[in-house]
């Protein structure tokens, strides 16, 4: 979940993240508890805003945060230091294949990406321009040492990777039997070249056996009011209780 941009940056076509309502976030925490999640994996943790919000809303379970940008990870480590159930992984990016990649670090840290910005994003958010590039190791999530060694059996995976969610999800295939839920950033318009659109991401999640459960508002373009991104929460079909399955709809 993202920090609200300073209103001074909301002029013109700059992006303004819609403040995510407390009620959907509380529903998410309730969902974690009902699904008996024993580990939340926060991929693309930035400064730890997502984990901090879960804690604020009462989630007391284990959290593993993953962030490749050194200064953000250092801040994340400091933030998690007083919480024995909150761990920070090694500084890596997540992808479908191990290797190294160039991360384009944005002036807006939560807009940093392994993918190039689209012309639309360049026009909408000049402040998201890259200010430097760094080489980062890329690992598959199912090969991440902190997860390979983890005893967790009911993992909730959140991916907020600025267009790289599809690749990271592919790299989590070996963990899918242990992943009961997903939270994926969904782009309603193309903001990063090569990213999967929202329809393709939902199709991908469903093909892996996860059903849409909850949607959280994301970025809007302030001049038009058009929503540009949202978060989709998905539950593994066989992890959903019988009474809850009965309320599902196949409407598209």
Model-found features: residue ranges?
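Phosphate/nucleotide-binding beta-alpha loop and adjacent structural elements of enzyme active sites
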Residues: 1-252
């Amino acid at each position: 979940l993202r920090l609200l941009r300073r209103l001074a940056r909301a002029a013109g076509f700059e992006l303004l993240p819609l403040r995510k309502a407390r009620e959907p976030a509380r529903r998410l925490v309730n969902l974690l508890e009902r699904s008996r999640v024993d580990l939340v994996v926060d991929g693309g943790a930035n400064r730890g805003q997502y984990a901090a919000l879960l804690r604020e809303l009462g989630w007391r379970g284990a959290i593993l945060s993953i962030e490749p940008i050194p200064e953000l990870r250092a801040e994340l480590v400091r933030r998690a230091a007083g919480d024995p159930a909150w761990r920070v992984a090694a500084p890596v990016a997540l992808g479908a294949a191990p290797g190294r990649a160039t991360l384009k670090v944005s002036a807006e840290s939560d807009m940093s990406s392994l993918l190039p910005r689209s012309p639309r994003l360049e026009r909408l958010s000049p402040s998201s321009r890259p200010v430097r590039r760094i080489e980062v190791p890329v690992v598959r999530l199912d090969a991440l040492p902190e997860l390979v060694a983890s005893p967790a059996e009911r993992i909730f995976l959140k991916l907020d990777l600025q267009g790289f969610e599809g690749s990271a999800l592919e790299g989590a295939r070996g963990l899918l039997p242990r992943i009961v839920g997903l939270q994926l950033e969904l782009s309603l318009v193309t903001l990063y070249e090569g990213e999967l659109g929202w329809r393709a991401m939902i199709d991908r999640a469903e093909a892996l056996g996860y059903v849409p459960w909850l949607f959280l508002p994301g970025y809007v373009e302030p001049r038009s009011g058009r929503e540009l991104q949202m978060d989709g929460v998905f539950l593994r079909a066989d992890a959903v209780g019988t009474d809850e399955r009965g309320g599902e709809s196949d409407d598209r």
